[in-house]
Structure formats: structure tokens, C-alpha cells
Amino acid sequence: MSVILSACGKKEAKIEYGKVDCDFCKMKLMDNKFGVLMISDKGRNFHFDDINCFKRFQEENNISSKEIHISCTDKPGELVPIETAYFIHSDNIKTPMASGIAAYSSEEIANKTAKELQSNILKWVDIK
């Protein structure tokens, strides 16, 4: 008799840059400083290459999310819950789909960058 054990731990949220396409604009996600991962209530992963694609997808589709994670400019490729990120909007920020919005995991770095760009820090509730 053999026994099979499986781990029941939560999988780490991650985006496979260069391998997945944006579920809104259909372009391949390439820049690991930007990207959104939405996990639906049914467990399906939706990928977006820019926060604007994510916002427009939400406006056009009635899909409930269980989790939403965003890649941070100060830690490329690392995803954080979108509610904990700090955002800066500036025409000087070059993003995949020209939203000009970048997420940061650190309030200190976001403050420094906002000052350099003469911008303000926003939270997710301010831009969603």
C-alpha cells in the first residue's frame, strides 16, 4: 500500500513574464516592473500587463476576484496584494500601455519617487 501526501499550502502568487498574455489587450507580459494578477472566486488566474488593462477588464466583465496582486517597480517581479501597494501617477513613468501608473511596495521609496516626479502618492482605493 502506498500513501500519497500532498501539500495543502497556498501557492505563491506569481506571473510568468514572457510566457503569459494580458487577458485584456492580448499582448505578452514582458516588463516585470508592471503586471497585475487577479485570481477569480473560481480560482482562475487573469493576467494584465498594465493597471489600465486590469481596470478596463473589470469595467467590461463581471468577474469577482478572490485576490488581486500587483508587481512593484521597486521590486521587479515581486507581487504584493494590491491594497498594500503605493501608487504614483506621472506622465514621466513609462508603462506597457501608457497608464503612467507605477506601484511601489515601500512608502519610503514611493515618497522619494513622487517628490522627484512632482507627483502624489495614491492608494488602490484612490485609483480603482
Language model features with spans:
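Short metal-coordination and nucleic-acid-contact micro-motifs, chiefly zinc-binding Cys/His arrays
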Residues: 18
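Post-signal-peptide N-terminal segment of Sec-exported extracytoplasmic proteins
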Residues: 23-63
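C-terminal partner/receptor-binding element of secreted or periplasmic proteins
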Residues: 103-128
